[in-house]
Amino acid sequence: MDPTISSHDTESTPLNETGHPNCTPILTLSFLVLITTLVGLAGNTIVLWLLGFRMRRKAISVYILNLALADSFFLCCHFIDSLLRIIDFYGLYAHKLSKDILGNAAIIPYISGLSILSAISTERCLCVLWPIWYHCHRPRNMSAIICALIWVLSFLMGILDWFSGFLGETHHHLWKNVDFIITAFLIFLFMLLSGSSLALLLRILCGPRRKPLSRLYVTIALTVMVYLICGLPLGLYLFLLYWFGVHLHYPFCHIYQVTAVLSCVNSSANPIIYFLVGSFRQHRKHRSLKRVLKRALEDTPEEDEYTDSHLHKTTEISESRY
């Protein structure tokens, strides 16, 4: 068993050798995860349907489509995991191997989600800082290629993590090396996300040549902020605390469930962010989900957007008179 995902074992221990109180799962948190995942799956399914079948593909929409796919995958893993925890709580049968597999499977969408978010922030940062170079040298299908590479790399890391954890008892050094690689990769992604987001924020808000604020940059900023608050703690718990061999006793052994709830909130919040940003300052009669999502991903300043909308309405009125 991979020590990075040994939270199931720490929570089901009746009494440890130090005499600390029993650390059983908190049922309220499991039900909270169930509710959060259902809401998040509904929102991400709508995003997948709109971007996959109802809207024209653009560079940013390819990233958002894959991010919604990673969030849905992650929420599915935690939905089933919480269901098994509730079954265990009431004394019904739940195979331990299934929970271990789910714990390792959730690593795949977690890595891919962070990678896609870092790619979005980095690409928009390059577009703002060096626009001419970016538009001249960017390959046409770069978004799809990057997302495909991210998924392949995430699956390879997830499979390696599971396999090394399976052999962890006899090959202790193996899972340590694999976990070190995954931890280093996550730290690199976090630094890339933080650096590119900070540079993008400074370029938009500060300096003599500030870039006009658009809905797309508001969407990216809110998504990154929610991830840093809600999504990052789970990664710190799984890949740093357990890699350094920190054993959490009561009441800190419940940190895994708390970070799981926060990470589910992070994956569920992204569709809400898209629809809130897209529906801001929009007339109610024009609030179709497709239109709202399209506006949330538009890289057009508010003034230009208002002008284009006003010209479009004027054209429609003039055409209706003839």
Swiss-Prot record:
Keyword annotations from UniProtKB, A to Z: Cell membrane, G-protein coupled receptor, Glycoprotein, Membrane, Receptor, Transducer, Transmembrane, Transmembrane helix
Glycosylation sites: N16
Topology within the bilayer: Multi-pass membrane protein
SUPFAM superfamilies assigned to the protein according to its UniProt record, in alphabetical order: Family A G protein-coupled receptor-like (SSF81321)
GO molecular function, one term: G protein-coupled receptor activity
Subcellular location: Cell membrane
Tissue expression remark: Expressed in a subset of IB4-positive small diameter nociceptive dorsal root neurons.
Bilayer-crossing regions: 31-51, 60-80, 101-121, 143-163, 180-200, 224-244, 258-278
Family matches, as Pfam families: 7tm_1 (PF00001)
Record-stated family: Belongs to the G-protein coupled receptor 1 family. Mas subfamily.
Protein name per Swiss-Prot or TrEMBL: Mas-related G-protein coupled receptor member X1
Gene source species: Mus musculus (Mouse)
